[in-house]
Regions:
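N-terminal glycine-rich beta->alpha transition that marks the start or flank
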Residues: 1-35
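Short amphipathic alpha-helix with an adjacent loop that forms part of the alpha/beta core around
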Residues: 163-172
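NAD(P)H cofactor-binding loop motif with strongest signal on the N-terminal glycine-rich segment
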Residues: 114-115, 182, 205
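NAD(P)H dinucleotide-binding glycine-rich loop of Rossmann-like/cofactor-binding domains
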Residues: 23, 33, 53-116
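Glycine-rich phosphate-binding loop and adjacent beta-alpha segment
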Residues: 185-253, 286-290
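A glycine-/small-residue-rich N-terminal strand-loop-strand element
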Residues: 35-58
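Mid-domain Rossmann-like dinucleotide-binding core that forms the NAD(H)/NADP(H) cofactor-binding site
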Residues: 49, 88-160
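C-terminal capping/lid region of NAD(P)-dependent oxidoreductase domains
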Residues: 253-257, 269-290
Length: 290
């Protein structure tokens, strides 16, 4: 492995959350994947894999070496750095899946909350690329500056009491689409930033899943889309979306915003930073050191 993916879900699983979808028995190796080089193959596997740069989605990513099936790996496109590819292993799948679900249209206002996270930074770029106008919501000046650099037209600090009113004012009455990357009470509140008839796509779990008022949403014609309530995407879908994410990155149309890297021995520090909401951009573990 060259680099291992680190996502907020890893911190939740470490604490025992999500056993229905992600069963873990102690002791276990955390992590869900990363990127590296194939060192050897087993019987019946094409030896041409040896030496190739690949991404891998596996349940033991925080390791210098992992064992994976041929179905769990995918070649890294020529010219794309392994570290960049590792940053897309999960967030690329998440962002492209929700981009497909939310389907932002040219000229629409799109609100991305937790816009400076691994998936949020990608959703900002995807919405801008689709011709939408993006409002990015985050919790610090550094995070808002990153979102603006990625193409957000308007940025708001969602720690301010009036942040929803500011979104509605900037968008002329509310966004057509909200991507909720925060969850919890903040995610539920972000429904108020939608215009009537809008779409609400939530993937945030940092504070638990958002639980918006369904009756109120129905009266306003708002569609509540909560795909993670059904568990992670199946392997075939995840593989398709990861391939698209890698291709987009290789072509320069998608840029993971890697904001923090740690040596493997400091994985706990990576988790602490995510839990404290101090990380700006994507976090990775680098097997060769920091």
């Amino acid at each position: 492995m060259v680099a291992a993916d680190v996502i907020f879900l890893d911190t939740l699983l470490r604490g025992g959350w999500g056993q229905d979808f992600f069963p873990r028995t102690l002791p276990y190796v955390p992590g869900g994947g990363g990127a590296g080089e194939v060192l050897a193959v087993g019987d019946g596997v094409d030896p041409g894999w040896v030496g190739r740069s690949v991404v891998v989605r596996t349940g033991t990513g925080y390791a210098e070496q992992v064992v994976a099936s041929a179905q769990e790996i995918m070649p890294v496109p020529a010219g794309l750095a392994a570290v960049t590819a590792a940053a897309l292993v999960h967030d690329g799948v998440t962002a492209l899946g929700f981009h497909r679900l939310g389907a932002p249209q040219k000229g629409e206002w799109v609100l991305v909350s937790a816009a400076a996270g691994g998936a949020g930074t990608l959703l900002v770029q995807l919405a801008v690329d689709a011709g939408a106008r993006v409002v990015a919501a985050a919790s610090s000046d550094a995070k808002l500056a990153l979102a603006r650099d990625l193409g957000a037209e308007v940025v708001v600090d969602y720690t301010r009491a009036d942040w929803v009113e500011r979104v509605r004012e900037a968008t002329g009455g509310g966004a057509a689409l909200v991507y909720d990357g925060a969850g919890g009470a903040l995610g539920a509140t972000s429904v108020d930033a939608l215009a009537d008839g809008g779409r609400f796509v939530t993937y945030g779990t940092a504070d638990g899943f958002a639980a918006p008022d369904r009756e109120s949403a129905a009266r306003r014609g708002i569609r509540l889309l909560m795909p993670l309530m059904d568990g992670p995407p199946d392997q075939e879908t995840a593989r398709e979306l990861l391939g698209l994410a890698l291709e987009s990155a290789a072509e320069g149309r998608l840029r993971p915003a890697i904001g923090a890297t740690y040596p493997l021995a400091r994985a706990a520090d990576a988790h602490r930073a995510l839990a404290a909401r101090t990380t700006v951009g994507k976090s990775l573990l680098l097997m060769g050191g920091e």
